[in-house]
From Swiss-Prot:
Intrachain disulfide bonds: none
EC number: 3.6.5.3
Keyword NADP: no
Domain tr-type G, residue spans: 10-205
Keyword tRNA processing among UniProt keywords: no
Pfam family, one: GTP_EFTU_D2
Catalytic activity line of the entry: GTP + H2O = GDP + phosphate + H(+)
Source superkingdom: Bacteria
Main subcellular localisation: cytoplasm
Keywords: Cytoplasm, Elongation factor, GTP-binding, Hydrolase, Magnesium, Metal-binding, Nucleotide-binding, Protein biosynthesis
Source organism per UniProt: Borreliella afzelii (strain PKo) (Borrelia afzelii)
Name assigned to this protein: Elongation factor Tu
Ligand binding (GTP): 19-26, 82-86, 137-140
Region annotation G3: where it falls in the sequence: 82-85
Upper lineage: Bacteria, Pseudomonadati, Spirochaetota, Spirochaetia, Spirochaetales
Length: 394
C-alpha cells in the first residue's frame, strides 16, 4: 500500500511533556491524543499503552525512551515527545529535550515539585527551551489548600530556572480527561492546555537556509528497503536524492537519502524542526548509530578536543557537593550522544560547585561538533554542569 503524503498546511512545532516520574506525563500525552482525535477525523487516538510501547516500560509502567506522537489544533501541527522522568533514563530525556521548541511541565498537585522536576527544568533551560506551560495534574487527589501552595512553589521554581513569571498554569486531571473523553468538564483542562499552547508558545524561527544537519536519535532496518535513521532536523532542508555524510564516532562516510518520512507519511522535503526518518542507500544498520549526525557534505567535522565555558551546578541544584580537579572524567552530552571526556583546567587547581569556568576537554572518541554548541555534563546519574563550546582545538 502506498503511503500518504504529509500535507504541510499548518505551522509545525515540537513540544513535549517533562517532569518527575509518575506525575502523569504519559497519561496527559494520551489524553491530548484522544481529545484531538475527536476534533479531527484523520487523527489517530493513542492510548497510554500505545505510547508506553516497549515491553520493559509496560512491565514497569514508566517511560524509558522518548516517544513521539502527532496531533493538530485549529492553528498548528504539533509533534509531541513524551519524555521519561525516571532518573536512570534521564539521558534519554536529554535527547527528547534537544528536540523540543517548548515544553509542558507536569507537576502532581498532591505531591508538588520533586528532585526531577528541578532537573528537567534545568535541562530544558540548558537545551534552549524558552517557554514552558505548567500542567498541575491529579487535581482530584489534592487538597485545595495544598494546590495553592504547590502553585506558588512551582512558579518560584519556574522563575528560578529563567522562565517567565507569567508562565501559564493549567489545572486538571489527565487521567480524568483520558478516561472520560466525552465529558466536556473532564476534558476542559486539555482544551485549555491546547489553547494555551497555541497562544503562549512562539513559533520558532527555523534555520532553513543553513547547511543540512540531523542528529541521529535512532536507527532501524526495514526489510527490503534498507536502513532508516531518525531524528530532528536541526538546520537546513533534505530531499530524496541528496548526498549526506555520516559524521562522528566512526570514520566519516557518504550516502544518499532515498526516502524522507514524518510520522509514517512521505515528505517532499524535510526541513529544520521536522522529526523525520531518512532512508539511506547502501548503509547497514551496524554502520550508523545514535549520536552520529547526518550532514551536508563538508559542513561539519569530528573532533575530540575543545575549549568550553561551563557552569557547575550547586549542591542545591542537584549538582556535586565537592569540587572537581584536573583529570576529572564525566560524560559529555552533545545533541543525542554521550561521550566520556577528561577535563584539564587552565590556571586553576579545582572547580567548585556554583563556579563559571573555562575548561579544556578531551573526549575518548571523536564526535561531530561545532562552535557554540551547548552540552550537559553528567556523572553518576545526575547533571553536574552545563556548558558551551568556545573553540575546537583538535
Amino acid at each position: 500500500m502506498a503511503k500518504e503524503v504529509f500535507q504541510r498546511t499548518k505551522p509545525h512545532m515540537n513540544v513535549g511533556t517533562i517532569g518527575h516520574v509518575d506525575h502523569g506525563k504519559t497519561t496527559l500525552t494520551a489524553a491530548i491524543s484522544i481529545y484531538c482525535s475527536k476534533l479531527n477525523k484523520d487523527a489517530k487516538a493513542l492510548k497510554y499503552e500505545d505510547i508506553d510501547n516497549a515491553p520493559e516500560e509496560k512491565a514497569r509502567g514508566i517511560t524509558i525512551n522518548a516517544r513521539h506522537i502527532e496531533y493538530e489544533t485549529a492553528n498548528r501541527h504539533y509533534a509531541h515527545v513524551d519524555c521519561p522522568g525516571h532518573a536512570d533514563y534521564i539521558k534519554n530525556m536529554i535527547t527528547g529535550a534537544a528536540q523540543m521548541d517548548a515544553a509542558i511541565l507536569l507537576v502532581a498537585a498532591d505531591s508538588g515539585a520533586e528532585p526531577q522536576t528541578k532537573e528537567h527544568l534545568l535541562l530544558a533551560q540548558r537545551m534552549g527551551i524558552k517557554k514552558i506551560i505548567v500542567f498541575l495534574n491529579k487535581l482530584d487527589l489534592a487538597d485545595p489548600e495544598l494546590v495553592e501552595l504547590v502553585e506558588v512553589e512551582v512558579l518560584e521554581l519556574v522563575e528560578k530556572y529563567g522562565f517567565s513569571a507569567n508562565t501559564p498554569i493549567i489545572k486538571g486531571s489527565a487521567f480524568g480527561a483520558m478516561s472520560n473523553p466525552e465529558d466536556p468538564e473532564a476534558t476542559k483542562c486539555v482544551k485549555e492546555l491546547l489553547e494555551s499552547m497555541d497562544n503562549y508558545f512562539d513559533l520558532p524561527e527555523r534555520d532553513i537556509d543553513k547547511p543540512f544537519l540531523l542528529a541521529v536519535e535512532d536507527v532501524f532496518s526495514i526489510s527490503g528497503r534498507g536502513t532508516v535513521a531518525t531524528g530532528r532536523i536541526e538546520r537546513g532542508v533534505i530531499k530524496v536524492g541528496q548526498e549526506v555524510e555520516i559524521v562522528g564516532i566512526k570514520e566519516t562516510r557518504k550516502t544518499t537519502v532515498t526516502g524522507v518520512e514524518m510520522f509514517q507519511k512521505i515528505l517532499e522535503q524535510g526541513q529544520a524542526g521536522d522529526n523525520v526518518g531518512l532512508l539511506l542507500r547502501g548503509v547497514d544498520k551496524k554502520d550508523i548509530e545514535r549520536g552520529q549526525v547526518l550532514s551536508a557534505p563538508g559542513t561539519i567535522t569530528p573532533h575530540k578536543k575543545f575549549k568550553a565555558s561551563i557552569y557547575c551546578l550547586t549542591k542545591e541544584e542537584g549538582g556535586r557537593h565537592k569540587p572537581f580537579f584536573p583529570g576529572y572524567r564525566p560524560q559529555f552530552f552533545f545533541r543525542t550522544t554521550d561521550v566520556t571526556g577528561v577535563v584539564a583546567l587552565e590556571g586553576k587547581e579545582m572547580v567548585m560547585p556554583g563556579d563559571n569556568v573555562d575548561i579544556v576537554v578531551e573526549l575518548i572518541s571523536s564526535i561531530a561538533m561545532d562552535k557554540n554548541v551547548e552540552f550537559a555534563v553528567r556523572e553518576g546519574g545526575r547533571t553536574v554542569a552545563s556548558g558551551r563550546i568556545l573553540e575546537i582545538l583538535e
